[in-house]
Amino acid sequence: MRFHALSLPHTVTTKEYCACAFTQKVLKLCAMLHRRGHTVYHYGHKDSIVECTEIVHVTDNELLKEAYGTYDWKKDFFKHNNADLAHQTFYKRAIVEVGKRKQKGDFLLCFWGQKPVADAHPDLIAVEPGIGCFNRTFAPFNVFESYAVMNCVYGIMENKNPAWYDCVIPNYFDPTDFEYREKKGDYLLFLGRLITNKGVSIVVDIAVRTGMKLIIAGQGDYRSIMGGQEPPPNVEVVGYADVAKRRELLAGARALIQPTYYNEPFGGCVVEANMSGTPVITSDWGAFPETVVHGTTGYRCRTMDHFIWAAKNIDTIKPKACRDWAMANYSMDRVVLMYEEFFSMLQDVSKGKGFYEIHQDRTNIDWLVKYRPSSFPANERVVWPIASVPSPAAPKGAPVGPVEPTTARNLEPLKPLEVEDDGFLGEVKMRA
C-alpha cells in the first residue's frame, strides 16, 4: 500500500513534541506502516525525524516564526488556526508535492483536517485517522480514537446511521519510550495541559485531603487556573515534561490521576502510565471506560469519596496487569494490524466489490479483539509479535519490513489463552 501522511502545519514531527498527541500519531503511524513494508510519504516540517520512505518539506522554522512570532510552546500552549499563514501555506505546498508523487489507489492521511489537500486530489482515498476532536468530519472514511468520540461526533452531525467504513482504532504507543517499574515512588502524578477542564483543582484537592505528595507536570500556568494561589506544600509543579522527564515521572508514580471534566476523547497519558506499570485514577466518562479496566488497571471515579478511596487503595493494583493491558492493546505492534485491516477494507471499496467482497483465505476477524489482564497467563507478558504477522497487502514470501527485535518478542511462544471481545459476544477462544 502507498500512503501520503499530512502532518500538523504548526509542529515538527519528532518525539520532542510529546505534548501534542496528534503530532505523535503522525510520527508513529508512519513508522508502523513503513516497518510493514508499505510506502509512506511524510509531508511536513523540514526538521521532522520520521521513519518513512521520504520526508517531503512543506514548512520550516521561518514560516512558523512569520505565522506565530517567537513563543515557548513548552511553557505556553501551541498556536494554530486553520486560516493562518502556516496552515494555508502548508495546504498549497502539500497539494503540489502530493501531485508529484501520487499514484491511483494511494491513501491520503489527513491528520489535522487538511480538507483543501483532499479536495485537490479526489482520486486519492482520503482518510481522517485518529480523530480526537469534537468537530464535523469531511473525509469519506474516518478512524476515531475511541467509541466515545465517534458517538459524540455522530451526535454533533446528527448522524443516526453510522458509516460501515468508519471505525474505531485506539491510539498507539511505543513501549521503548517508557520504563516498566514495579517499585514505585511516594508521589501521585498529574500529567497534561494545565487547564480547568483537565481537573487540576480536583487533583490538588485529593492531595490536600490525603496528605499525599503530588507532582503536576505539563504546559500552562498553575496559578492562572487556581485563582492566583500558590501550590500547597505537598504539591510540586514542575512545568513541561520532555521525553526523558515524562518517562521518569510515569515510571516512578504511585498513580497517575486524570479527573477530566470534559468528554476525554482518549487520554493517552493513561496508556503511557500503564505501559510504565503505573495504575491510573480517572473520571468515568469519555474514553476512560474503554481504556481503564476498573479495579485491575486503575479506578474510575464519580465523587470525591471515590477519588480519595482510590488514592488510598491504589497499591492493590498490580503493575504487571497495567503493563500487560497496555502492551496487548495499545502497542504499535498491536494497533498496526488494526490499521492494515481497515485499509484493506478500503481497498475493497476502491478496487473490488466493497461491502460484498469476500476473502476466501481469511482466517480470523481478530482485529477488534481486546485482551483482558484477567486472562493473561501469570508468568508471561502478552504482546503482538508483529514480525510473524504478514501484511495483507504483501505478496506471499515478501518481507514484512525492518522490525527491530525487542525483549517482548524474544519471549517463548504464548500458550493458548482466553480473551474477551469488546463485551458483546462474551468470551471467545483464540490461540496466540
PLM regions: where:
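Catalytic cores of nucleotide-sugar-dependent glycosyltransferases that transfer UDP/GDP/TDP-activated
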Residues: 1-387, 397, 401, 423-432
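Acidic, proline-/serine-/threonine-rich low-complexity intrinsically disordered repeat tracts
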Residues: 387-421
